[in-house]
């Protein structure tokens, strides 16, 4: 599933061409993705101006004129791309993409040219909703999200407070979107490896006031922010379905230290990386380095 770095990469790719553009028409390739499209979705979008694009956690937000915002989630396999006539011919040979195009929006950019914004989703686990812009962050999907690991916003002190009485594992606590918003399986595994912390360790062990616990929490917070920053710089991680808006791939997956490396040697100690299952998700870690 695309995580914060992948969604932020998409936002940065779409923003230059979409900001200030006018929606000409919208066609839907199906009645629903994970959820049904909003009622009269095509008609409600036609003629609107896209004021700006933002992101909250793993949600991409299209702010429109008339005080409505499209809340988009990529699900497991969703992707956005922008086409003009030349790119349309190119993608016509990429059957997988064309076969699962479920949302096609024609728009006029500020340069006067006509483009198409296309949402593709083979598994249809993504979704699009319309929300009141003035009350956007009161929406049930957004109102309980925690801090984002951007620009060192997440600190050791913040994590310690969040982990008080948390009997769950560190892995589960970090996947809790009310604590750190936008983190997913990949980057939690990588941040824990960098911090020498086992995904099975209880979160509350970092919540004490001891100097050791404070240092561990501080280190973890810094590594979370660092790994997210590096992943954004690399254009995210391309695993299975995730691509940039032009169809190109991110390359942070080539920097993985543990994720997806079961049986391979840890680059620090030489011990083999192991995979365990926690709450139905794979966790990768080094049993020698991470305690």
UniProtKB/Swiss-Prot annotation:
EC number(s) stated in the UniProt entry for this protein: 3.2.2.23, 4.2.99.18
Annotated catalysed reactions: Hydrolysis of DNA containing ring-opened 7-methylguanine residues, releasing 2,6-diamino-4-hydroxy-5-(N-methyl)formamidopyrimidine; 2'-deoxyribonucleotide-(2'-deoxyribose 5'-phosphate)-2'-deoxyribonucleotide-DNA = a 3'-end 2'-deoxyribonucleotide-(2,3-dehydro-2,3-deoxyribose 5'-phosphate)-DNA + a 5'-end 5'-phospho-2'-deoxyribonucleoside-DNA + H(+)
InterPro entries for the chain: DNA_glyclase/AP_lyase_DNA-bd, DNA_glyclase_Znf_dom_DNA_BS, Formamido-pyr_DNA_Glyclase, FPG_cat, MutM-like_N-ter, Ribosomal_uS13-like_H2TH, Znf_DNA_glyclase/AP_lyase, Znf_FPG/IleRS
Span of zinc fingers (FPG-type): 257-291
SUPFAM superfamilies cross-referenced by the UniProt entry: Glucocorticoid receptor-like (DNA-binding domain), N-terminal domain of MutM-like DNA repair proteins, S13-like H2TH domain
A single BP term in Gene Ontology: base-excision repair
Cofactor annotation remark: Binds 1 zinc ion per subunit.
MF GO annotations: 8-oxo-7,8-dihydroguanine DNA N-glycosylase activity; class I DNA-(apurinic or apyrimidinic site) endonuclease activity; damaged DNA binding; zinc ion binding
UniProtKB keywords: DNA damage, DNA repair, DNA-binding, Glycosidase, Hydrolase, Lyase, Metal-binding, Multifunctional enzyme, Zinc, Zinc-finger
SMART domains in the record: Fapy_DNA_glyco, H2TH
Domain of life: Bacteria
Covalent S-S links between cysteines: none
Positions of the catalytic residues: 2-3, 58, 281
Keyword Cell membrane assigned: no
Role noted for this protein: Involved in base excision repair of DNA damaged by oxidation or by mutagenic agents. Acts as a DNA glycosylase that recognizes and removes damaged bases. Has a preference for oxidized purines, such as 7,8-dihydro-8-oxoguanine (8-oxoG). Has AP (apurinic/apyrimidinic) lyase activity and introduces nicks in the DNA strand. Cleaves the DNA backbone by beta-delta elimination to generate a single-strand break at the site of the removed base with both 3'- and 5'-phosphates.
Quaternary context: Monomer.
Similarity-based family: Belongs to the FPG family.
Name this protein carries in UniProt: Formamidopyrimidine-DNA glycosylase
């Amino acid at each position: 599933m695309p995580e914060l770095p992948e969604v932020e990469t998409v936002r940065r790719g779409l923003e230059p061409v979409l900001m200030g553009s006018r929606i000409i028409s919208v066609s839907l390739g199906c009645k629903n993705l994970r959820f049904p499209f909003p009622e009269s979705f095509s008609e409600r979008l036609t003629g609107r101006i896209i004021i700006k694009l933002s992101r909250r956690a793993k949600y991409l937000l299209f702010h429109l004129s008339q005080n409505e915002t499209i809340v988009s989630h990529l699900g497991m396999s969703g992707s956005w791309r922008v086409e003009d006539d030349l790119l349309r011919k190119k993608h016509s040979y990429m059957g997988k993409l064309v076969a699962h195009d479920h949302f096609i929006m024609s728009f006029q950019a500020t340069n006067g040219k006509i483009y198409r914004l296309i949402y593709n989703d083979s598994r249809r686990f993504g979704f699009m909703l319309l929300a009141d812009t003035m009350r956007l962050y009161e929406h049930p999907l957004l109102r309980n999200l925690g801090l984002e690991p951007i620009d060192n916003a997440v600190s050791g002190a913040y994590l310690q407070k969040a982990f008080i009485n948390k009997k769950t594992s560190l892995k589960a606590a970090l996947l809790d979107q009310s604590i750190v918003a936008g983190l997913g399986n990949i980057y939690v595994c990588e941040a824990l490896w960098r911090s020498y912390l086992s995904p099975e360790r209880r979160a509350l062990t970092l919540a004490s006031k001891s100097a050791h616990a404070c240092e561990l929490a501080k280190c973890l917070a810094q590594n979370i922010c660092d790994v997210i920053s590096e992943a954004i710089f690399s254009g995210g991680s391309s695993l299975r379905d995730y691509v940039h808006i032009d169809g190109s791939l991110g390359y942070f997956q080539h920097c993985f230290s543990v994720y997806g490396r079961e049986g391979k040697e840890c680059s620090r100690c030489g011990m083999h990386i192991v995979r365990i299952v926690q709450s139905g998700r794979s966790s990768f870690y080094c049993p020698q380095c991470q305690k």
